[in-house]
Design a protein with these regions (language model features):
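Mg2+/Mn2+-dependent nuclease catalytic core
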Residues: 60-81, 89
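Conserved catalytic cores of phosphodiester-cleaving nucleases, focusing on short active-site segments
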Residues: 23, 42-63, 79
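Hydrophobic "anchor" residues on beta-strands that sit immediately upstream
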Residues: 29, 52, 96
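Short alpha-helical functional segments enriched in proximate histidine and acidic residues
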Residues: 86
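Domain-level recognition of nuclease-like catalytic cores that cleave nucleotide substrates
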Residues: 91-123
């Protein structure tokens, strides 16, 4: 592993810790971290009241595209596939769900609620 990749992973892991703390401060229940499904990975899964929230965490150390902008349509589809997998596995089909992005750049943490709509087949 080269230094940039290692630094990026450490930065991403620290960002996920900060994002989780933000959600806990907002009284969300954390259900899963780094959930892996076939062809998908979801950084955080939380519950906000009755809503299941699938969260993509984007940590930026340099300026450039915002976290929301860097969650491409393909990435959204993968997150949605992972969300369906999680909900089926845990008997949550039919529950309300949403997709949030948490952007972290320096000391600024921005929680974008409903950052993108469901991208995939209707189940």
């Amino acid at each position: 592993m080269d230094r940039d990749t290692g630094a990026s992973r450490r930065s991403g892991a620290l960002g996920e810790v900060r994002a989780e703390q933000l959600l806990r401060d907002k009284e969300y229940d954390i259900l899963a971290h780094n959930y892996v499904a076939p062809g998908a990975e979801i950084d955080l899964i939380a519950q906000d009241g009755a809503v299941i929230v699938f969260v993509e965490v984007k940590t930026r150390t340099k300026s450039g595209a915002s976290g929301r902008e860097s969650v491409t349509r393909e990435k959204q589809r993968r997150i949605c596939r992972g969300a369906i997998h999680y909900m089926m596995k845990h008997g949550l089909m039919g529950r309300q769900a949403r997709f949030d992005v948490i952007e972290i750049q320096g000391t600024r943490v921005t929680h974008i609620v409903n950052a993108f709509p469901y991208q995939g087949p209707m189940v």
